């Protein structure tokens, strides 16, 4: 009989699932009896595996409401489903899931699923008002990691974060990434004139402000080059101002479907990712699939993927001058970017895991944790 697993997190899902998410959950369902407690992103479909929570208005209350009620919702799901394990995406979520387990008074394992630095969301994401929540979030994260029956990490960096809290990871393996749209065709030659591409949310943790400052320094040195920004977020004014100042050398697209992101990478010389915090950097793997090198900050999980001078150029986080210098090199030295791109395409091979392999790793994690937890 399959183990029963409850996935818990703030992730937003729309039903019916997209083809890539359908692959992931269908593979998981082959190995485990999977159920999901998460947020509703809209949609008119139905899937018995999903219990999605609708948002509340005003939007500023949506997050606090979700987390305040999460222990009670987890407790309800545990009582109804009797899962063998709860996989909580995030350290704070693991603490709240552990509280839900106590409320339910049902024996089940709680596994913390760590994809980044638990301290980052209240310091670098969204509104500055989040900073006031940092002490509470830090306390919750520590309780979540230390109270979990197991911890899964996705990289050497996230493993280091967990060990810093005095906890040894139970397993380390990458998140499932549907890379098929980025592998359907062979990488295209680098474009001419050169283009630097940024893909991500326009938030402080992605350091869009640093990128804007760097581009003001770099643009005059590479007058035929363009910076293409893809994303939206609370720092949209930073992007808008940059386009207004350098309209001939800056483009901004708020939303691109996944196939169009692949095309944007083909039309780019290099990807730029100047983050202040980054768990892994999925877009780096996508860029590697398209044979593109990366200019990025030496922070978080980025150095776990990008080898400085081989598959990309790494600079100190927050250093606009160093970032500008790296961009000028990448956009003016075609031989360098061709070499970085060729090495990147080779380096991506270990990341090309099928959904079935990911599902088996999750199953093995659940078996390992449930098998070692005292009854």
PLM features: residue spans?
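N-terminal subdomain of nucleotide-sugar transferases
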Residues: 1-43, 374
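Conserved donor-binding/catalytic core segment of Leloir-type glycosyltransferases
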Residues: 6, 152, 188-206, 212-216, ...
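Membrane-proximal helix-turn-helix segments that form the acceptor-binding/catalytic region
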Residues: 24-26, 72-76, 118, 131-151
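Nucleotide-activated donor-binding/catalytic signature segment of Leloir-type glycosyltransferases, i.e.
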Residues: 240-259
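Aromatic "clamp/platform" in nucleotide-sugar-dependent glycosyltransferases that forms part
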Residues: 276
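Short hydrophobic beta-strand element within catalytic cores of glycosyltransferases
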Residues: 293-296
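Conserved acidic donor-binding segment of nucleotide-sugar-dependent glycosyltransferases
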Residues: 308-309, 313-320, 329-335
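A charged, aromatic-enriched C-terminal amphipathic alpha-helix characteristic of glycosyltransferases
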Residues: 335-366
């Amino acid at each position: 009989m399959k183990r029963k697993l409850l996935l818990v997190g703030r992730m937003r899902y729309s039903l019916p699932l997209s083809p890539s998410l359908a692959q992931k959950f269908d593979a998981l369902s082959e190995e485990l009896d999977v159920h999901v407690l998460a947020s509703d992103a809209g949609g008119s479909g139905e899937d018995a595996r999903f219990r999605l929570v609708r948002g509340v208005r005003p939007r500023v209350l949506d997050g606090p409401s979700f987390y305040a009620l999460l222990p009670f919702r987890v407790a309800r799901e545990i009582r109804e489903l009797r899962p063998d394990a709860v996989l909580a995406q995030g350290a704070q979520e693991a603490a709240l899931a552990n509280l839900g387990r106590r409320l339910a008074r049902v024996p089940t394992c709680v596994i913390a699923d760590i994809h980044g630095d638990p301290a980052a969301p209240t310091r670098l994401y969204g509104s500055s008002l989040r900073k006031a929540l940092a002490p509470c979030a830090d306390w919750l994260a520590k309780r979540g990691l230390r109270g979990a029956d197991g911890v899964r990490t996705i990289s050497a960096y996230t493993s280091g974060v967990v060990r810093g809290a005095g906890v040894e990871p139970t397993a380390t393996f990458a998140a499932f990434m549907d890379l098929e749209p980025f592998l359907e065709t062979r990488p295209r030659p680098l474009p001419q004139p050169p283009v630097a591409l940024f893909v991500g949310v326009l938030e402080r943790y992605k350091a869009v402000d640093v990128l804007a400052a760097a581009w003001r320094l770099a643009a005059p040195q590479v007058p035929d080059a363009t910076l293409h920004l893809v994303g939206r977020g609370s720092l949209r004014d930073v992007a808008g101002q940059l386009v207004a100042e350098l309209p001939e050398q800056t483009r901004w697209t708020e939303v691109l479907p996944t196939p169009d992101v692949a095309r944007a990478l083909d039309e780019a010389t290099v990807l730029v990712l100047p983050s202040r915090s980054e768990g892994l950097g999925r877009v780096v793997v996508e860029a590697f699939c398209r044979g593109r090198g990366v200019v990025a900050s030496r922070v978080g999980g980025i150095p776990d993927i990008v080898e400085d001078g081989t598959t990309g150029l790494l600079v100190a986080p927050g250093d606009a001058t160093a970032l500008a210098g790296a961009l000028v090199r990448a956009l003016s030295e075609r031989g360098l970017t061709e070499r970085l791109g060729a090495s990147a395409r080779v380096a991506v091979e270990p990341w090309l895991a099928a959904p079935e392999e990911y599902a088996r790793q999750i199953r093995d994690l659940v078996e390992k944790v449930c098998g070692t937890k005292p009854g």
